[in-house]
């Protein structure tokens, strides 16, 4: 279960950042995870208070989340938003069956490459035929879900891990292929020196079983402005 925070209108800079100024869904483990990380990790003890009530925000439905990740591959954020707006407006409702009814020419006209059209069709087929077990995901472990997702064209492990974090809000995902995570670990733990996957795993050993939460704070540490001024070191 997740709890709902109701408050006044507001917005966040990124889709995955939320604060108490918006109606948001907080993963039920978030507070406990923060307590654990502050206790176990010196960097988390410094970072977490800087961002106040900001937290990970779960994203839309499974199909559109994965479709959007495909649309956004290898293009800028602005370009991805423009293409997504055009593509998602093509069907009356964005469902696997409706995407399969779209004409390739119309999808290309929305700004999609031929390869991305193929990927979106394959994604739609997997959902439409039940090749992915959406209703079973809540009871499946992370690696089993990743195995299902990477069988879809255009979805590699990193995309599957982002899906676990931002859609399924799994608490203990460590996306070692994520450039931002590695960069953040380098800056926060190694004074900017080069970091290997082994180094990252060693750092993350203290984060378990809340690697997703720690990763989220590492990402936030790379943002230009924290939500709250950093407290003085004790």
Predicted regions and their residues:
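Structural motif
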Residues: 56-64, 111-115, 204-211
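Short alpha-helical scaffolding segments that buttress acidic/His motifs in well-ordered protein cores
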Residues: 66-71, 120-124, 163-164, 214-218
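Non-catalytic interaction surface on structured domains
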Residues: 50, 58, 62, 109, ...
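Alpha-helical ds-nucleic-acid-binding substructure associated with the helix-hairpin-helix region
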Residues: 24, 43, 75-76, 80-153, ...
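C-terminal accessory module of base-excision DNA glycosylases/AP lyases that mediates lesion recognition
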Residues: 1-54, 138, 142-143, 157-234
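A general alpha-helix detector
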Residues: 65-70, 102-106, 144-148, 180, ...
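Alpha-helix C-capping/helix-to-loop hinge sites
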Residues: 54, 69, 73-74, 90, ...
């Amino acid at each position: 279960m997740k709890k709902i925070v109701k408050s006044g209108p507001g917005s966040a800079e990124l889709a995955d950042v939320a604060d108490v100024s918006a109606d948001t869904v907080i993963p039920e483990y978030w507070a406990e995870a923060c307590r654990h990380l502050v206790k176990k990790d010196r960097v988390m003890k410094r970072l977490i208070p800087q961002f106040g009530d900001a937290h990970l925000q779960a994203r839309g439905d499974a199909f559109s989340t994965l479709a959007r990740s495909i649309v956004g591959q290898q293009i800028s954020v602005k370009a991805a938003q423009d293409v997504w707006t055009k593509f998602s407006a093509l069907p009356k409702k964005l469902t696997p069956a409706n995407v399969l009814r779209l004409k390739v020419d119309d999808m290309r006209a929305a700004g999609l490459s031929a390869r991305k059209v193929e990927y979106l069709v394959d994604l739609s087929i997997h959902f439409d035929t039940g090749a992915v077990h959406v209703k079973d995901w809540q009871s499946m472990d992370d690696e089993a879900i990743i195995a299902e997702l990477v069988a879809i064209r255009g979805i590699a492990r990193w995309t599957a891990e982002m899906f676990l974090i931002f859609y399924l809000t799994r608490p203990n995902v460590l996306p070692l292929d994520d450039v931002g995570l590695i960069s953040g670990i380098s800056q926060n733990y190694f004074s900017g020196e080069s970091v290997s996957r082994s180094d990252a795993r060693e750092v993350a050993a203290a984060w378990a079983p809340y690697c997703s939460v720690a990763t989220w704070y590492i990402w936030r540490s790379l943002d230009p402005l924290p939500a709250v001024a950093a407290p003085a070191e004790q």
